Amino acid sequence: MAMQKIFAREILDSRGNPTVEVDLHTAKGRFRAAVPSGASTGIYEALELRDGDKSRYLGKGVLKAVEHINKTLGPALLEKKLSVVDQEKVDKFMIELDGTENKSKFGANAILGVSLAVCKAGAAEKGVPLYRHIADLAGNHDLVLPVPAFNVINGGSHAGNKLAMQEFMILPVGASSFREAMRIGAEVYHHLKGVIKAKYGKDATNVGDEGGFAPNILENNEALELLKTAIQAAGYPDKVVIGMDVAASEFHRNGKYDLDFKSPDDPARHITGQKLGELYKSFIKNYPVVSIEDPFDQDDWATWTSFLSGVDIQIVGDDLTVTNPKRIAQAVEKKACNCLLLKVNQIGSVTESIQACKLAQSNGWGVMVSHRSGETEDTFIADLVVGLCTGQIKTGAPCRSERLAKYNQLMRIEEALGDKAVFAGRKFRNPKAK
């Protein structure tokens, strides 16, 4: 089924920054997709095209990307008469038309907007749910509901507190279904709010970009202690484990790391990667930490490799791998991590996202699907995680509509699957293992 019309516009994301939305029309109707954007971005990500006109949205407008769709990509696709079910052909055509390594001609935000809309239209054309269409594109027979990783304490570049590490997450791995995981996560979240309020006052329960709390604490183990207390208070010590996203590239300074990077710089307090690794090992020993993302800088390969060889938890590459097959292959070769963080806008098309996921899975890695800190009400990644069977998703706290949009869609998908629904649970790192 051919595309009839493609129209892009500038809308606002959850942080009040412009982003790209695309409407694609076929005989089956209108299919809409919106593109997310990140705050802590890896230097190897595909290029998000911003206008740079400081007199408008402080330079963050996306009218150039919108124009690239409306004047170039859209007309070229309509002329080519490609079918919306041919995701790979459509994506390949756009990538070749762009012709750059990092999609800098049109912008990854332009190409991805169209790619997502095409995927939604393709599902409708086949008369199947989006998650089933994505599973077909990936060659998956199975469908798996993921364990949600709720980011309930925010630090790093996502919050105005002193905390260096960016996300402290709870994973209800002991739940029996996705719906139960939502309930457990929400209950722990509310208990955490009470614990923080009692200890630091009401102001400390203000929420960050992703719906988590941002109490003004400096010590990272204090955040872990708060989680441990809230998990106990909610009555789920046997069902909930902890994950972290350190985003260490944000506080990497001249080969070392600054755990107080939001204060005036003082090289005397910078620590080595090895020392930082020892701190993580103490977290793993004292708390139920099962997953650490970006523990070191995106180019500190040697420290990643030596750390992975000494722990048996999940080590996730985000800034390290940026959903890019070349970086993933490098990380596999160097044995730097054992899980990929999958963000569709880091690579910039549905096809390449699926390829990145399959490359990681074929090397025995886990895959965690992820939102960005600047989100929209688009729910594409909820269907994506089910179709790709990755078993884990992080899309914020159980708070703020742009986060709940994804979680609520996952509850609907589980409901639609009925007794065929499979929840990853404790097998979240490799849900397909029998």
Swiss-Prot record:
Mg(2+) is required for catalysis and for stabilizing the dimer. It catalyses: (2R)-2-phosphoglycerate = phosphoenolpyruvate + H2O. SMART domains: Enolase_C, Enolase_N. Mg(2+) binds at residues 245, 293, 318. It is found in: Cytoplasm. It is an enzyme of class 4 (lyase). Belongs to the enolase family. This is Beta-enolase. It comes from Oryctolagus cuniculus (Rabbit).
